[in-house]
Amino acid sequence: MKSNNPFTRHGIEHLSPSKINLWVTDPALFIGTYLCGMKGSYGVGAFRGTAVEFALNKKIVDTDLSKEATNEFLYGSFNEQCIEKGLSTENIKAQKERNTLETYYDQAFNVYKDFGVPEFYQHKIYYTLHEDLPTPFLGFIDFVFNDAIRDLKTTARMPSSISTNHQRQLAVYSKAFPDKELWVDYVTPKQAVSYKVENVEQILNQVIKISLGLQKFLSISDDPYELASMHYP
């Protein structure tokens, strides 16, 4: 029996902040990736962020962890991700990122060292955001503390303000812990800056409107290539 859900008819079993943000910033790439099966590229910068978060969690949970042990988690996580993607750790880009890991980690630790032990790390959320959106949202929260949700972003250049994409991401997470503050922590090798997400309900309503708009677009046709023809890359 044919589904009445436009998302599942196109093979989209769940929504996520990254999918919604991609739909807004680059509809053609969204269509190519999620409707037409085009394989997306990946950057080793993402490996860097995951490795820093992993080692950071190990350290703030066990404050007695030595620098050597922490580095084992840091470099081990990075190398493992490279291997999983079939990327040699001798790759020039991988080496460049690997050489900066400790500087990113040190900046992140200076931010997180006084927050205590997190209640959750990489906490999975999975829920329906709106009654008119049958497809649930899936996401993973970096750190959940007693009073706040915190998302760590490693970046080569410090932004002047919190990005709209990251505000949407944290707003989606807020549904799981509505009483907690939302913070995005940007970390470069030289500094760290934290931004609190304000106007959460307004941003969440924006996410809902974007999602409903995407749902309406997908309902136009079950043929992904017909939908693709409506957007010039």
Question: Whereabouts are the PLM-identified features?
Answer:
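Metal-dependent nuclease catalytic regions and adjoining charged, substrate-binding loops involved
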Residues: 15, 98-101, 121, 133, ...
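A general structural signal for short secondary-structure junctions and capping/turn motifs
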Residues: 21, 173-176
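A generic signature of intrinsically disordered, low-complexity regions enriched in glycine/proline
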Residues: 30, 57, 68, 146, ...
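Short, surface-exposed beta-strand-loop junctions and turns on beta-sheet-rich folds
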Residues: 38, 156-159, 190-191
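Generic recognition of stable, solvent-exposed alpha-helical segments in well-folded globular domains
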Residues: 47, 51, 165-168, 205, ...
